[in-house]
Amino acid sequence: MNTFVLQLDEETIQHLIQTLKEYQVQNANPYIRFAAKFKQATILIYASRKVVFQGKNASAVAQELGYKPVVHKSNQDNIKNKQDCSLIGSDEVGNGSYFGGLAVVASFVKQADHAFLKELGVDDSKNLTDVKIKQIAPLLEAKLPHKALLLSPQKYNEVVGDNKLHNAVSVKVALHNQAIFLLLQEGWQPDKIVIDAFTSPKNYQKYLKNENNRFSNPLTLEERAEGKYLAVAVSSIIARKLFLDNLDELSQKVGFNLPSGAGQQSDKIASQILKTYGELGLETTAKLHFKNTKKAYQLLKKE
């Protein structure tokens, strides 16, 4: 199967979504904001504005839509030659999912850990199944120094939104900074600190000024870092398990199978929760500022 990857600006992505709207398909991956099947190719648009074309006709479809694709290199190729020092890597999971909390993890990885990680098959958690994530995450947690933070939906809704302490970006800055700070406080001394970029360095520094717990170590924000640095991949895997466990726990509490992601299935489940519990049900299970909340109310009115 051929795979091609593009990094597009928001305006171009909106145009592509409009073009492929009638070919849209459901996708449960919380990192994917739009998915479509078009002429024997699958097109995936990630929240990071990465666009992936997959399938036998991936190249032809990409070119037909006006894009010049770049062959996607394997994550192992990306990881190679970037692991010659001790690293703290940080990543978050849940920011693209309507239901569930926001998990942020920072992990410390030494060069001596690489053989263990490669034996486990550690890679970008976006390419691992949930079953695999749940198998290897406990092994990583037991062996590697890390700090894991989970902002529950209820707490998220208290601090994120209009006229509140945080917006969707600043809250991630706060969580990443705190996770890394706590790890450094334990005495771990990395040669480099890398965060999987979710905003520009300038924007990160702007929001960082509001944080009390600061550190002087140099910090790098790098796009798709979870596919380039084992330390970030480790954090991505642990954070994914933390998010999934939280989603399972919330599902049991409300009696509905809460999906990850922010698609139509989330709208439907949200409307059922509204019908059963009122808005309080969403306040404790979902991120209210997502558009899904409005859509859920609209679905409820149609009943």
Swiss-Prot record:
GO terms for biological process: DNA replication, removal of RNA primer; mismatch repair. A divalent metal cation binds at D91, E92, D196. It catalyses: Endonucleolytic cleavage to 5'-phosphomonoester. Keywords: Cytoplasm, Endonuclease, Hydrolase, Magnesium, Metal-binding, Nuclease. It comes from the Bacteria. Its EC number is 3.1.26.4. It is found in: Cytoplasm. InterPro entries: RNase_HII/HIII, RNase_HII/HIII_dom, RNase_HIII, RNase_HIII_N, RNaseH-like_sf, RNaseH_sf, TBP_dom_sf. Manganese or magnesium. Binds 1 divalent metal ion per monomer in the absence of substrate. May bind a second metal ion after substrate binding. It holds the Pfam family RNase_HII. One of its GO terms (cellular component) is ribonuclease H2 complex. Residues 85-302 form the RNase H type-2 domain. Its cofactor is Mn(2+); Mg(2+). SUPFAM superfamilies: Ribonuclease H-like (SSF53098). GO terms for molecular function: magnesium ion binding; RNA binding; RNA-DNA hybrid ribonuclease activity. HAMAP family: RNase_HIII. Belongs to the RNase HII family. RnhC subfamily. Endonuclease that specifically degrades the RNA of RNA-DNA hybrids. This is Ribonuclease HIII. It comes from Streptococcus mutans serotype c (strain ATCC 700610 / UA159). The lineage of its organism: Bacteria, Bacillati, Bacillota, Bacilli, Lactobacillales. The gene is rnhC.
